[in-house]
Amino acid sequence: MKLVYFIDGIQGMGGMERIIIGKANALANELNHDVTIISAYSSDKPICYPIDSKVRFVSLDIEKARHDCNALMLVYEQMRVFLQTLCRTRRQLRQIKPDAIFFVWVLGAIMLPFVGGKARKIFESHSSLSNTPHHYFLRLMEQFADTIVTLTEGNAKEFKHCKDVRVIPNYTQKPSKRVIDYSAKRAIAVGRLDPVKGFDRLIRMWKNTEDLHADWTLDIFGEGPLEDELRQQIVSSHLTDSVRLRGYSDNIIDEYSNYSVHLMTSHAEGQGLVLLEAQAAGLPSVTFNFQFGASDVVTNESNGLLVAQDDEIAFQQAMCRIMNSEEDRKRMGEENLRQSCRYTKVSIIKLWNELLKDYS
């Protein structure tokens, strides 16, 4: 089949970009589909994840809307982006003649009802509605999508007007090594350094309990707009000896094995890819029960500790408990390894191929 992925931008270093490119590569290289990725926005940044030679990549070179202008100019800028994107996307689709188009993120939701053509239109939801900017556009998209694919059952229940909603979770690659030393007094947190990930409250909770785990260290991997602010928070909290911002890692999947506990403080997620990555390495997680996905991966007391969203006192207690018990870390980590088979690349790509077979 001829397949197109439409996404606003593919140059980011986040989990969504990694998953989209990974799926496109697998569908082309392993299942022999004809795959094209269309990226709307122009960018000087390199693509962070390798695109298979069998996958065609097209940039529409649309300049993002300016926001440093008055309200009237902002409306003009948004209309310019919409019309340019629509015209250039239609031109590409006329040339490709795809059998199915996957639309991703907000710009994808906006484009889906207007691109026309006979191709099946599939929207991929990578975030809860409450955490999706301008999510009202998704309501119009529901009326036109042939299928909406979500990562979790919770997110699926938010789409009540689409005729076909399916749940296909993310997959994670198998790390080259797993956790061996559960006695290591090292904690890890991973994600883009922006407000939704809640790293500010993680640092605050680490400070509140530092006397109870003075011999532990916390490494936070990721880049983003809050980097300077978080660094200043670490300094002002006198945590420079125990908390480090490690920046971006191009091989994060193999970092988890160097730690004995994973901490996740997100306010919201599409699924929480880092939970799957930690699980694949046999690393137990302490996580808030965010919408959506935490409870799909972590069963409280079995393979990690699940804390009611925003209950920082309970999170601090859970964090200290697992850091004080090597036995719990080992037991929960080994259970994570047993459960990780649910999210292998082979099993998840099979679900995508079954969806495409329904259209053939």
What are these regions (language model features)?
Residues Y5-M13, A26-Y76:
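N-terminal strand-loop element at the rim of the active site
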Residues Y248, H267:
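Aromatic "clamp/platform" in nucleotide-sugar-dependent glycosyltransferases that forms part
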Residues T299-E301, L305-E312, R321-E326:
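Conserved acidic donor-binding segment of nucleotide-sugar-dependent glycosyltransferases
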Residues T85, F102-A109:
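Short His-centered aromatic/hydrophobic patch
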Residues P284-F288:
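Short hydrophobic beta-strand element within catalytic cores of glycosyltransferases
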Residues H126, S130, Q143-K177:
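Donor nucleotide-sugar binding/catalytic pocket of nucleotide-sugar-dependent glycosyltransferases
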Residues R231-G247:
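Nucleotide-activated donor-binding/catalytic signature segment of Leloir-type glycosyltransferases, i.e.
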Residues G14-G22, K185, A189-A214, P225-R231, ...:
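A conserved mid-protein helix/loop that constitutes part of the nucleotide-sugar donor-binding site
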